[in-house]
């Protein structure tokens, strides 16, 4: 198994955004020992005379409200990394030093991500039926205001969002990632 790790890594690295490793045929293998899939274990299985990937999962086995069950799937985590890297790279290449850190420019950056980039990421990475968005992080803005020695209680949300934060840009995102079909539940009645 260990000698095949590089082939699995190559499979994952070369997987297009519109599919996962689930059920992928491993043409270079003739036979594997059947293995009961376990949470956190990437495994292969025999499907008649074909070797297939059982489920493209990583080793994650604990989940919470931030790291949901979907984060065990390699396709989902790859999509997460892809989007975060793209946004950080875009910010670094095109925004740092080129735009004043004010409300309008922060909103323009958010709008570019939400209305252009996220639309391009649907349907292969993000769920196009969900309102995927990035916006100014109001809670981080409040913390910045408090650090400056002011109170936020008497401020409107717009005043909080417009508060100048120097060169810091605090954003938050709400997105839904997509995965491929992997499990079927079928009920038929007559």
Located regions from the model:
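Long, contiguous all-alpha helical interaction modules
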Residues: 1-9
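Structured, hydrophobic secondary-structure cores that serve as assembly/anchoring elements
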Residues: 8, 12-24, 28, 33-190
